[in-house]
């Protein structure tokens, strides 16, 4: 069994969805988390989770989208979580690569998402791109001010220092198809060293199809490719990857039963 801890199922057409879910189940992917990126999209996330028993959801505003509308308040974010199949908050974080919103706006949004996690106890799904120092600083500041909160560094491709900082505070790291890319030697070295009980896998589909399928549309079934590379770098078999990452997923997302 595998879990795709981060995908965007609402990006598929209605005609594609049944087939995408079906192929995931055939590949042994028995849980999928479809991710929130805008406030107005939360209803669609919840509808997908209601429709498919294998699908759960998160709610939040992606850092690339925070300049499109006023940042939701902490109270508004908490209200969005009030659904039995919402198991996390995000994805939120900082994206200084695209810089589609002012950095101070991204930072304020990130802080509000963290505070919503502190209020609800739900895990934070973190997006980090070219912003490692500010991500680590904000996480530490908010933890000191408001207390601990569970967190997942999604689609990890950042520095060893950021991964270790997240793990040191009890967080988790999710590996995507980037792990399979030929040039990802450093990422594979980090993945080999991270604590076993902090690892998850994901697709971030429909983006980031794994090697040798780069350039094609990604989907949850293909998380098996990432799992296979993780097995190789850890010296495990694929069954152990499934056992470890599924156990870690359920420990983090404890509302997913």
Region locations from a protein language model:
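Mid-domain alpha/beta scaffold segments of enzyme catalytic cores
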Residues: 1-257
